[in-house]
């Protein structure tokens, strides 16, 4: 079943679905700065655009462009900067 989610006053929208192996969501972020929390480990894949990310325990920001991905540990917070509309796929667990 699909579930539509909206965060940060509509600046981030996603659709959750049951992926082939694990739960997932696909979404779009408007330009801005955001802080997300994780319950379980996540793999974030950038589909279009770019995400500049400060991962838990890291001191330096890293930029991931379309076709790239990064891992986020579970039970953590991470920060994201977005310069232009960016689409992503997030796989949980």
Swiss-Prot record:
Record carries keyword Glycosyltransferase: yes
GO terms of molecular function: guanosine phosphorylase activity; purine-nucleoside phosphorylase activity; thymidine phosphorylase activity; uridine phosphorylase activity
Cellular component GO terms, alphabetical: cytosol
Top-level taxonomic group: Bacteria
EC number: 2.4.2.1, 2.4.2.2
Keyword line: Glycosyltransferase, Transferase
The UniProt record lists the keyword Transferase: yes
InterPro entries given in the database record: Ppnp, RmlC-like_jellyroll, RmlC_Cupin_sf
UniProt xrefs under Pfam families: Ppnp
Catalysed reaction equations from the record: a purine D-ribonucleoside + phosphate = a purine nucleobase + alpha-D-ribose 1-phosphate; adenosine + phosphate = alpha-D-ribose 1-phosphate + adenine; cytidine + phosphate = cytosine + alpha-D-ribose 1-phosphate; guanosine + phosphate = alpha-D-ribose 1-phosphate + guanine
Family the entry assigns: Belongs to the nucleoside phosphorylase PpnP family.
PANTHER family: PYRIMIDINE/PURINE NUCLEOSIDE PHOSPHORYLASE (PTHR36540), PYRIMIDINE_PURINE NUCLEOSIDE PHOSPHORYLASE (PTHR36540:SF1)
Role noted for this protein: Catalyzes the phosphorolysis of diverse nucleosides, yielding D-ribose 1-phosphate and the respective free bases. Can use uridine, adenosine, guanosine, cytidine, thymidine, inosine and xanthosine as substrates. Also catalyzes the reverse reactions.
Protein name per the record: Pyrimidine/purine nucleoside phosphorylase
Organism this protein belongs to: Shewanella pealeana (strain ATCC 700345 / ANG-SQ1)
